[in-house]
């Protein structure tokens, strides 16, 4: 009996050394597991992007100089850029001193309007000195931190992604849907935000900053960029507005992907698509999704937000997607884009006749459009547009020059298509 008691006492002491926790309820154990997972995620996040959450990193003289070198590319012909670069090091030191002292570096905006695809857009451009500061903050803090929390199928204005990436992901999503169901029966919810930048609320935007920026000085600087626009909304033009607008509804994106477990979802800035098998389920998801958007102050465009049958095709990023019965995905340009290009070529012909443009410039613009169209199922559209360009300008810039060597002498000739 003494031996048994001694063994029991030893085990009890060992348990005490290891730490014996009191009896926990199911909810308490669930909370403890959640806290452990959260601490593990925070540690991984700190290892990945902890170095970017640093105010001094993006306000140093070297960071501002590098931001200036990146910001001046392609715009050195502007007077403001040239004047800044005449004394770039002195200007960088002055910006660093103001930021180190916590002073306001905002200088206001240049406001102008442009017409893009028939839409009148109000653009606000920054003074170049402030543009350099914001470029440094975006490169060294905002973009690496905010992009880390985005879903993979959100590729607007990010390095390595873009429109081509989004279109490829949409095609991949359709291929995955066909492999799962082996048909093209289903429904697509096409979503478009109305005046997205103008309707972004500041308080929800500040909540996004509070979740990601733990350095209080960096947090206050990013908030200052937003409050300079007025009571609500973000201005189109500053680089920080782009990454902020991308991350603004990211919480809803994760709700769709992680909580509702809907894989067939993609967002590109203010355009989104969501595919489901049942129309009734899609309507329920739509109503719940619209309620979440309303909490963020996001207003939907009633004309462009609609549910369509997958077999009829849908339009996303100016591209018409069709999932065929055999699993093939067709990508065709939308009709409006083709009409706009024909009108543009006719305008170029008028500019050439008036001496405002040379044929080479018109050819470069057309070849850019043509190269983009060659990635789509638009052979007939490209052929008809080639005929229109030849009839207007009497040249074929898409015909490449071939080079061969004969007895050490290069001979060039042009392929003549009949």
Kindly give the residue locations of the regions a language model identified.
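Short Gly/Ser/Thr- and Asp/Glu-enriched loop/turn motifs at secondary-structure junctions
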Residues: 109, 266-270, 302-303
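Conserved pre-motif C helix in the palm subdomain of viral-like polymerases
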Residues: 119-151, 230-257
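Conserved polymerase palm-domain catalytic core
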Residues: 168, 173-269, 273-292, 308, ...
């Amino acid at each position: 009996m003494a031996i048994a008691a001694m063994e029991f006492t030893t085990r009890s002491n060992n348990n005490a050394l290891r730490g014996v926790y009191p009896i926990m309820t199911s909810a308490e154990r669930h909370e403890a597991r959640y806290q452990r997972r959260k601490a593990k995620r925070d540690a991984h996040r700190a290892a990945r992007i902890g170095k970017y959450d640093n105010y001094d990193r993006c306000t140093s003289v070297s960071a501002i100089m590098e931001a200036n070198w990146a910001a001046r590319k392609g715009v050195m012909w502007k007077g403001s850029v040239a004047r800044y670069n005449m004394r770039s090091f002195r200007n960088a030191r002055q910006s660093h001193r103001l930021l180190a002292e916590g002073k306001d570096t905002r200088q206001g905006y240049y406001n102008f309007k442009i017409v893009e695809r028939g839409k009148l857009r109000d653009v606000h451009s920054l003074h170049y000195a402030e543009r350099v500061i914001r470029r440094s903050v975006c490169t060294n803090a905002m973009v690496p931190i905010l992009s880390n929390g985005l879903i993979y199928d959100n590729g607007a204005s990010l390095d390595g992604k873009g429109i081509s990436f989004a279109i490829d992901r949409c095609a991949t999503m359709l291929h995955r849907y066909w492999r799962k169901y082996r048909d093209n029966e289903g429904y697509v919810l096409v979503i478009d935000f109305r005046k997205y930048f103008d309707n972004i609320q500041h308080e929800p935007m500040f909540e996004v900053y509070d979740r990601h920026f733990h350095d209080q000085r960096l947090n206050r600087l990013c908030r200052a960029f937003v409050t300079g626009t007025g009571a609500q909304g973000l201005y189109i033009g500053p680089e920080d507005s782009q990454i902020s607008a991308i991350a603004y509804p990211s919480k809803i994106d994760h709700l769709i992907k992680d909580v509702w477990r809907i894989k067939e979802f993609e967002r590109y800035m203010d355009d989104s698509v969501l595919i489901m098998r049942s129309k009734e389920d899609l309507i329920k998801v739509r109503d719940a999704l619209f309620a979440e958007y309303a909490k963020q102050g996001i207003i939907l465009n009633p004309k462009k937000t609609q549910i369509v049958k997958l077999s009829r095709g849908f339009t996303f990023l100016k591209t018409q997607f069709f999932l065929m019965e055999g699993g093939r995905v067709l990508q065709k340009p939308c009709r409006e884009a083709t009409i706009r290009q024909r009108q543009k070529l006719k305008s170029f012909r008028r500019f050439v006749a008036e001496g405002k443009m040379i044929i080479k410039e018109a050819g470069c613009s057309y070849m850019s459009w043509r190269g983009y169209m060659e990635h789509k199922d638009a052979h007939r559209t490209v052929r008809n547009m080639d005929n229109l360009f030849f009839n207007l300008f009497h040249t074929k810039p898409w015909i490449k020059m071939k080079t061969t060597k004969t007895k050490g002498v290069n001979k060039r000739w042009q392929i003549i298509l009949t």
